[in-house]
């Protein structure tokens, strides 16, 4: 049986991204992504969504999981950039 080590949760990732947005550490890719704006973030979300689909059709479950993690990251970057909170999204689940 494979042992899984939980590194991040959806909530902990959001907290990390929110912190980076507030503190703006030098050289942060997240800060650069936030500064690039909604158009750039939206393009990345579309790109990652396509990669999720391709991975689901043609790649391993590990590759699919990685692509999904990238889609979640970019979606949360957009949320932070737009000032949304997790609760704003949770209301619609």
UniProtKB/Swiss-Prot annotation:
What InterPro entries does this protein map onto?
HisE, PRib-ATP_PPHydrolase-like
Q: Which UniProt keywords apply?
A: Amino-acid biosynthesis, ATP-binding, Cytoplasm, Histidine biosynthesis, Hydrolase, Nucleotide-binding
Recorded catalytic reaction(s): these are:
1-(5-phospho-beta-D-ribosyl)-ATP + H2O = 1-(5-phospho-beta-D-ribosyl)-5'-AMP + diphosphate + H(+)
Q: Extract the GO molecular function terms from the UniProt entry.
A: ATP binding; phosphoribosyl-ATP diphosphatase activity
A biological process term (GO) from this entry: L-histidine biosynthetic process
Pathway stated in the Swiss-Prot or TrEMBL entry: Amino-acid biosynthesis; L-histidine biosynthesis; L-histidine from 5-phospho-alpha-D-ribose 1-diphosphate: step 2/9
The EC number(s) attached to this protein equal 3.6.1.31
Where does the UniProt entry say this protein principally localizes?
cytoplasm
Location of the protein in the cell: Cytoplasm
Q: Which GO terms describe its cellular component?
A: cytoplasm
Pfam families, sorted: PRA-PH
Return the NCBIfam families for the record: histidine_hisI (TIGR03188), PRK00400.1-1 (NF001610)
Q: Which family does it belong to?
A: Belongs to the PRA-PH family.
Classification via PANTHER family: HISTIDINE BIOSYNTHESIS BIFUNCTIONAL PROTEIN (PTHR42945), HISTIDINE BIOSYNTHESIS BIFUNCTIONAL PROTEIN HIS7 (PTHR42945:SF1)
Put simply, this protein is called Phosphoribosyl-ATP pyrophosphatase
Q: What is the lineage of its organism?
A: Bacteria, Bacillati, Actinomycetota, Actinomycetes, Mycobacteriales
Tell me what gene encodes this. Answer: hisE
